[in-house]
């Protein structure tokens, strides 16, 4: 658990804070999209959000040591939501 506390925002939570809990996916449940699996490797900061037609573009400032894992057309997850990477800069 020390690694979870170090790599997530759980250390910032206090008693009474609201958190997102989701029901377990059952095998017979339908999916709208795809399953996100993986491990938390770090915390990014949402630097900017803007609308581009029907799309929402989210700019995430990412720790430098994680940037080598962020690939154009790859994916990241924010709060369990899978997002496609459309542009990669030095730190976003």
Where are these regions (language model features)?
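Conserved loop->alpha-helix
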Residues: 1-92
């Amino acid at each position: 658990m020390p690694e979870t506390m170090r790599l997530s925002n759980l250390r910032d939570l206090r008693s009474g804070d609201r958190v997102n809990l989701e029901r377990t996916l059952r095998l017979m449940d339908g999916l709208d999209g795809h399953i996100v699996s993986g491990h938390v490797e770090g915390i990014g900061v949402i630097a900017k959000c803007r609308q581009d037609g029907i799309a929402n573009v989210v700019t995430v400032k990412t720790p430098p040591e994680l940037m080598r894992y962020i690939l154009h057309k790859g994916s990241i997850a924010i709060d369990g939501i899978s997002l496609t990477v459309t542009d990669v800069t030095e730190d976003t």
